A protein has these predicted regions:
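Extreme N-terminal leader/anchor segments
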Residues: 1-32
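Compositionally biased low-complexity segments, especially N-terminal hydrophobic helices
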Residues: 9-10, 116-121
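Polar low-complexity intrinsically disordered regions enriched in Ser/Thr and small residues
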Residues: 14, 113-115
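Long all-alpha helical scaffold domains
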Residues: 34-112, 121-252, 256
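Eukaryote-biased recognition of C-terminal alpha-helical segments
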Residues: 268-300
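Conserved small/polar residues in nucleotide/adenosyl-binding loops
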Residues: 302-307
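N-terminal low-complexity segments that are often proline-rich with Ser/Thr-Pro
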Residues: 309-311
């Protein structure tokens, strides 16, 4: 549930805005708890904030539905992709609200689902808390779209699509996860002692996880593209360069996951990175290097960018 809090008062919050008529407070809890803390209760009599909290929870429900779908079947992956896209729509709708501004509420005709179409109604509210802010909504939109694209990629793999199609879908996944990582990294560089910061609402392991996933899908795309490049004298050098960069990027991501003080990503994500590094990237790279040394003798021009990846 979303936090619609105002000022703290003994672990509870209450909106002290102008009251007219019957005062009916709506209670919610923080979506995420601060490190080592508990989710605090929020109470507000603002209908506008109640609508925002409902939008947040609609997005949360859709993303939960997507996460629980059967990813081993095409039907399950289609459900996941559609639900993640709907969740992104709700969070994008929510993100039209920002501190001190009005909320533009837009519903698609007849469907009752959020869209990015022109606004049909506006609701003014005085202040929006961090977990309902435009910045937080942008993070959630990007994350849901990345997971929707990942579901499309997995469905394409199950359908035995061509390497060209899979490479395009994989690089789209990598780009989306890179976008999420950038947004998360930006939001996590605030003052940790501030009473309301993004650190309180975003699990820090998300940044590490999205960094690794971006490397995984970059490797998925690279491996498929290089299956063709390694068999041509004119392109084997490019293949070796791409595979080497992908190898260094994955190794950089895995080193980040091993930092003792860093938040730990899910074990399955780390294992996926280790598997594609070992079974695809290193295997294809070793084969390409041997073929080049024995047959093609292509000149290799390569500058490592692993340091740049680690600093990102």
């Amino acid at each position: 549930a979303a936090n619609t809090s105002s000022e703290e008062n003994n672990g509870e919050y209450e909106d002290e805005g102008t009251r007219t008529g019957l005062h009916l407070p709506f209670e919610w809890k923080d979506a995420f708890a601060p490190a080592g803390g508990e989710r605090k209760i929020a109470a507000s009599s603002s209908i506008a904030k109640e609508k925002l909290a409902m939008l947040y929870n609609l997005g949360a429900c859709e993303s939960a539905l997507a996460a629980k779908s059967d990813r081993s079947t095409l039907d399950g992956l289609k459900v996941a992709s559609a639900a993640f896209q709907r969740a992104a729509g709700y969070f994008q709708f929510l993100g039209q609200c920002d501190d001190g501004k009005k909320v533009n509420e837009t519903m698609s005709a007849g469907s009752g689902e959020p869209t990015a179409a022109t606004a049909t109604a506006t609701t003014g509210i005085d202040r929006i808390e961090a977990d309902l802010s435009g910045k937080m909504a942008a993070i959630l939109v990007a994350l849901c779209l990345a997971q929707a694209q990942e579901s499309v990629f997995e469905a394409a793999k199950l359908s035995d699509k061509s390497n060209g199609v899979l490479a395009k879908l994989a690089i789209a996944c990598a780009d989306l996860y890179e976008e999420v990582h950038e947004k998360l990294s930006s939001s996590l560089r605030g003052n940790p002692k501030a009473p309301v910061t993004q650190e309180r609402y975003v699990p820090k392991m998300w940044a590490t996880t999205t960094f690794i996933k971006a490397a995984i899908f970059n490797a998925e795309a690279t491996a498929r593209v290089c299956e063709t490049l390694v068999n041509d004298e004119e392109t084997i050098g490019s293949a070796i360069t791409l595979l080497t960069r992908s190898k260094e990027r994955l190794e950089s991501a895995l080193r980040r996951a091993e930092i003792p003080t860093a938040p730990k990503p899910p074990k399955l994500v780390v294992e996926a990175a280790e598997n594609i590094l070992r079974d695809s990237i290193k295997f294809e790279l070793g084969k390409a290097v041997r073929d080049n040394e024995c047959v093609y003798m292509a000149c290799l021009l390569y500058t490592s960018d692993a340091a740049d990846e680690e600093d990102s």
